[in-house]
């Protein structure tokens, strides 16, 4: 089995942002994405939207961008088009890592053969996927660099998840987790942490075995939290919960872009990239999902630990010169703003605590999406 990796001559960036629709009265999810897609396609053909797994969701997709600000500007225009169409239909755009109370039985899956296969195979867990995320693609010049960079990126898994965590509630309950989306998504058999392959050939051999055993026939592809996107010549980082505003998304995109390019440059210099033991990576994923920005994480193969907030500050300091070169210095600095203000999961909890209802958390996310920045519930 051959997998052709379409090499990217530059470390370009692309972003996919999953946005759902809610009823403004009930605040429940509304399975009317097809209507929004139709209106936007007719009025704004330059905007790239995709249908998604759920009939309540549209995905905003940028083109191939040179900088984070360019990608964010494209998402801003796409979001405005979605807002316009949704308002006309009597709906509100909303997004977060998960919806706090919607029932999966009331949220139909989109009509697509591969989606039907996933549900047929995964049953209860497949039906539970009322979750939304951000996917960041960064261009890679050669397939031999892909897995060394991915193996380094998983050392930063908790950093990206803690910053973006925005799914504390499920089925009307506070789960105690900052990112319940993370715990849900890994229930699918092809999702979760990537294996730490040592070469592109190992990856190709693995995919051949997945094909031979029928796994890919059922699912269409592997859905790892970080994976190669061979068709585009990118590494796709799928760790982040969907942020409910564009300002926080831009911080996630900037940190991701800088990390990938940082590790790529380390290869250029002949330096050894950082790695952790597989159990370290799994433990860090759980800690960030559970505690968010208050997580204590493992930072070395010797099992040394540090607070994720402190590690994020050190990362921003280390990556600042590179961010200036990549044109995303302002966006990278927003990482520090998230640390100081607190994450989306914290704002949702505060909204619930003030009102006694998760409806307030839905309203808050809708308002943030409209205002493009973090807010606090009144």
Curated annotation (Swiss-Prot):
It is an enzyme of class 6 (ligase). It catalyses: L-cysteine + L-glutamate + ATP = gamma-L-glutamyl-L-cysteine + ADP + phosphate + H(+). InterPro entries: GCL_type2/YbdK_subfam, GCS2, Gln_synth/guanido_kin_cat_dom, YbdK. The keyword rRNA processing does not apply. Keywords: ATP-binding, Ligase, Nucleotide-binding. The keyword Endoplasmic reticulum does not apply. It comes from the Bacteria. ATP-dependent carboxylate-amine ligase which exhibits weak glutamate--cysteine ligase activity. This is Putative glutamate--cysteine ligase 2-1. It comes from Corynebacterium efficiens (strain DSM 44549 / YS-314 / AJ 12310 / JCM 11189 / NBRC 100395). The lineage of its organism: Bacteria, Bacillati, Actinomycetota, Actinomycetes, Mycobacteriales.
């Amino acid at each position: 089995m051959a997998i052709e990796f379409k090499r990217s001559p530059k470390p370009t960036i692309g972003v996919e942002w999953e946005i759902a629709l809610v009823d403004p009265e009930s605040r429940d999810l509304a399975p009317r994405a097809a209507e929004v897609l139709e209106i936007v396609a007719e009025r704004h053909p330059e905007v790239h939207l995709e249908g998604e797994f759920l009939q309540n969701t549209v995905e905003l997709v940028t083109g191939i961008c040179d900088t984070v600000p360019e990608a964010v500007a494209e998402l801003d225009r796409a979001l405005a088009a979605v807002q316009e169409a949704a308002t006309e239909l009597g709906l509100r755009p909303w997004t977060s890592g998960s919806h706090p109370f919607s029932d999966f039985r009331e949220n139909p899956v989109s009509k697509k053969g591969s989606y039907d296969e996933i549900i047929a195979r995964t049953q209860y867990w497949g039906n539970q996927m009322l979750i939304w995320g951000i996917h960041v693609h960064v261009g890679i010049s050669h397939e031999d660099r892909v897995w060394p960079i991915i193996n380094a990126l998983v050392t930063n898994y908790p950093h990206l998840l803690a910053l973006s965590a925005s799914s504390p509630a499920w089925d009307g309950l506070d789960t105690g987790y900052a990112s319940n989306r993370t715990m849900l998504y890994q229930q699918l058999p092809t999702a979760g942490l990537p294996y730490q392959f040592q070469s592109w050939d190992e990856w190709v051999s693995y995919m051949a075995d997945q094909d031979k055993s029928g796994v890919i026939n059922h699912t269409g592809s592997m859905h790892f939290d970080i994976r190669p996107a061979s068709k585009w010549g990118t590494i796709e980082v799928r760790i982040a919960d969907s942020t409910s505003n564009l300002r926080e998304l831009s911080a996630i995109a900037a940190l991701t872009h800088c990390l990938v390019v940082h590790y790529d440059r380390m290869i250029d210099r002949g330096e050894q990239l950082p790695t952790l033991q597989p159990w370290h990576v799994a433990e860090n994923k759980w800690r960030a999902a559970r505690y968010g920005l208050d997580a204590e994480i493992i930072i070395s193969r010797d099992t040394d630990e540090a607070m994720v907030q402190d590690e994020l500050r050190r990362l921003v300091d280390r990556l600042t010169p590179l961010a200036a070169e990549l044109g995303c210095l302002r966006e990278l600095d927003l990482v520090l703003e998230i640390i100081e203000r607190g994450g989306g999961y914290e704002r949702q909890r505060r909204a619930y605590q003030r009102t006694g209802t998760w409806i307030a958390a839905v309203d808050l996310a809708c308002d943030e999406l409209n205002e493009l920045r973090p807010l606090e519930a009144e």
